[in-house]
């Protein structure tokens, strides 16, 4: 394989044994593809597909007026250009969106003409609000903050059959039910009651017999019975009764008479039970009629009304039970034929027949009225109202839609072959659902499993945005209908009809405040990717935490390869929020699919198919780790497989599919845990969750022991700068990389220059620091997709969340009791876990009633010292080191005339000066914060004069833009002249500056000319003259284009900012805060092994080995056995080997060994011990040296999940590094110098510092705010609250009998208002006595008792 620019600089030793059949897909595809389909940007009218915005418009338009004389049709739409780019939107706090313009056609019909002749057509583009655009990383910028729309896992539309698990009725009888769930519209439920009658509910309302619904559909009793039951036909001839025999129906019955064949031979004797053997004999004998006694009919139900043959009078209605009296009537009337329903107790129950018996309605109208009463109780029903309501419930496309998914699921479930059909229900649909439900009750068929991923589908961003958009359009439709009637009389245009506000509001509400639109988790690249790949069962139309039971949250067999069984939050959301598996994707219906390799006759092919949970059920699927021979055939006698959602073993020839990779089961975060297969699942869950909380360290350090997924995550997360096209690095500095694109990738007529501006020290959503560092040097050749610059938490294009630390597992003076972590001071000195946090502080100057607030350095009653960090505009300068309480932005607010104190009156009388009428409301650094000002932004309202600071910032930005554009022009110009030089040198000239006719042009001549003079050359070859003219035109066009671009940017910068009403100016100050690691910070490994730093010890006190190398971290060995995450120990061993090999390479370099020796040693590491072989021969000697230099700190290794390093390979690596194979060594106590009793496990573990820092949690209250009602101090750091002295603490003081302490706690330290004021004064005066008064909460108690109407008085003694 060819190595990329960064890969060949540091190759990871890969221990995987299984071949890569399929690359890991682009990890953000689920977000980007979904929204791309929603927008269909750039599609022409013909190319529009029936999805997304287009589908929403088509479903609402055409809108026809109430009179029918005017219609508004939809023609198409187009999206404009965004006003600001992503970075500008974040800075200005606006939404990154594009205007949507819709072309509509207003048609007015001629009233007079009978055939609706068209009188007038008007077409116009109408502005329909802004649609947020997705950034290239799958996020949205809404009001300046980066947000993610999480996909939702909801119940698929369709029909579901279920039972109550015996919980409803005391007997434990299973009551079956069916539910038709549409994509939008009313739910329809059918359910059995304990008496085996079928009922129907619409939208979970009161239940009605199911036959009421069937009657409302227009079915008569007889048609209903015919639909559900077969009939037995009896012929009466005089005194004999003959049954038309269907032998199968006799099965299981007891013969009431001898059953004989045609020859009189008895087949079944009277009193015997009829078996399958008897039925076979009857069929063979061809018995078609059976004589039965008359009482055989008693208790049977009539299927067709019995009519008197002579008079036509109805003797018995259908669905009546035959009794002796009825039989007598029938005999008297000489009826010759009776049809009865065929029912039995085993597989054909009389459920529908029984339901009809309890149904009070007898015709369609009564049934409709009954339904109307149930839906609209209390309203008087009319025939029209009842018909309209019923028609709109399930049969109107506007109110009801199953959607393509729903129709597909519906048809499949009730056994139809076609999967397409209308979105509304039909009579047949309802009958088929009832038939299936009755069949399930009869024991034919099974109920559905609602947690099966074939019954749950994923709604992605695009679909949810489309639904919201449709909601907005429906609101618009109502208003348009009203106005359409006026359109013709008043000559209105489409623009006057459509008010786009409801659409814009619906979209804004969805992106701004929907439960699934979340503030992006931006701690590190992994947390960004995981957030975008999250699938939530919560949200609108989903579950709620309280209602979700255990089953929904549990891991289901169909999760395999679709949803990660490990990664889910701990706490109330466990199992409701999941993460997509690595290779999973959604199909066109929204069901999750997983890829498999096709297996034919036990030969594994390279063909890959994606299957949903339903499609895979019938397949026999082998695991990715199944043993294959060289030809790719399965060799084991029995292969471990999945079949029908069960894990079993089968013969190789039965296998039809095979997993593509062992990591297809888990999510991205879980696949980053090395030796995951050796960790307990609970700890792996914590491990994958805690990696998302790692704070990017100052210097990222790649993991020595990784899994090989690190590069994919870093590349796909979008935090790195990836080359869009290949080429040569033209120039590079800390803030930009300029690439001159290779000729074969340049499109005609464009510059062939890619400028990548790097993000420097920017604040993330979690206040961590986003900073990019270039990896390339001038002159380097890069290919498309190579990584040009590292972002936060990435090291040479690999994800690097933490640091490799030398750890020892041993108890140490109790400092690592209960998961505490003991650190060496060296870790702090080397800034291994130092992180930078950036805080944004905002100062807003408003227009108040008393006058405008002013941002100024002239602040009353503030000394010089406090102002020495401000410039003349009153804003802190960049680079200032500030402490808590320092002024960042000086601001004064006018205050009203106040009563003057006597002193002020005196001063005013003496000096005659008016005391300042403004108060100081400056922005100060919050308590507990100190840092460096790294950036200041000033936003000024239109029409408000800009201060000097705003102008200098603007000038800086313009200079930067100008520099960019000049650079681009310089390269374009250079490239053009290079091409010209190649063409001109050696060609003959007709004339030119200081040139004779017919002279050959040389390099020296061209070098002596100014570039502008080149175009004055006249060449003998006309083609060259044409080339010169084209080049001149191209360069001047380019110059003009870049000047226009500059003017455009300049206009944007100089226009006033769109600020909230009443705001004149906003100043944003960005503080960079450096946080070193300290006791109280939380740290963790990748295996769920978390702990809190308890102590930082001097280096000389830490345990060290025989060479004198001290360890960095001492961990408690008791944290491993009970938690069963042994992966951390294996990681430690392999990490030791990796580091040892690095040191060995380092020694070879220092001894300046030959390259051949280095190559040989590298070959031993990469190709002789297990795993994948690396092709080191394709690297030149210089590249081998560069690789060796990068491996000095340790040889990075990859042990992919479920396919990682084996124990023997770890031992071989340790041996190669000249280290003990046990991974243990003798340590010495740094304090005493004595050797410890036993060998200790020492090695390198990858440790993370989590975003739970003691600085953010530590808090102490002096005097602060009090709660309004109880007058007690508030709680929590955000409110500057106190420590709660709760019920249990009171018990403790009571137990000690500490009466005075208790009194102080309950009064002056809490809510005795007068007492605490007096106490404060006393302490100021140096008097430490206290007088306790009445606590405010006691007054509250009295008031509450009085509110109950109880008169209560306090008596004074």
Swiss-Prot record:
Enzyme class: transferase
PROSITE patterns hit by this protein: RNA_POL_BETA (PS01166)
E.C. number(s) listed in UniProt: 2.7.7.6
UniProt cross-references to CDD domains, sorted A to Z: RNA_pol_B_RPB2
Catalysed reaction equations from the record: RNA(n) + a ribonucleoside 5'-triphosphate = RNA(n+1) + diphosphate
GO biological process: DNA-templated transcription
One of the record's GO molecular function terms: ribonucleoside binding
Keywords attached to this entry: DNA-directed RNA polymerase, Nucleotidyltransferase, Transcription, Transferase
Pfam families referenced in this protein's UniProt entry, alphabetically: RNA_pol_Rpb2_1, RNA_pol_Rpb2_2, RNA_pol_Rpb2_3, RNA_pol_Rpb2_45, RNA_pol_Rpb2_6, RNA_pol_Rpb2_7
Cellular component annotations (GO), alphabetically ordered: DNA-directed RNA polymerase complex
InterPro entries: DNA-dir_RNA_pol_bsu_ext_1_sf, DNA-dir_RNA_pol_bsu_external_1, DNA-dir_RNA_pol_su2, DNA-dir_RNAP_su2_dom, DNA-dir_RNAP_su2_hyb_sf, RNA_pol_bsu_bac, RNA_pol_bsu_CS, RNA_pol_bsu_protrusion
Signal sequence interval, chain numbering: none
Biological function: DNA-dependent RNA polymerase catalyzes the transcription of DNA into RNA using the four ribonucleoside triphosphates as substrates.
Subunit architecture: The RNAP catalytic core consists of 2 alpha, 1 beta, 1 beta' and 1 omega subunit. When a sigma factor is associated with the core the holoenzyme is formed, which can initiate transcription.
Family: Belongs to the RNA polymerase beta chain family.
Protein name: DNA-directed RNA polymerase subunit beta
Species: Pseudomonas aeruginosa (strain LESB58)
UniProt gene name: rpoB
